[in-house]
């Protein structure tokens, strides 16, 4: 399977899941994007189309901490950071959107860290 076909298949999976998952103000959607080198996460209110909180492995707060770490540890730090930012905005519950990626590896590490930091999903 070529890279293009894999990307298209992931987008098809994501669209299929997005038909069922919608974020609201009370329970926004936590969307994950995983690239080859980095991981990004946003907490989104789909009713207004606004991003309430975001974090990534290239975030300024994590700049010194992620250097030299493996990708799994980076994902854990990003999960903790986004959970802390969401909690400061008063968000306690989210709907997890894995973005068409398998729930394993870095995606699972990010989700577990966010749960441990206090987000409920």
Regions found by a protein language model. Give the residues of each.
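Ribosome large-subunit tunnel/peptidyl-transferase-proximal elements
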Residues: 2-121
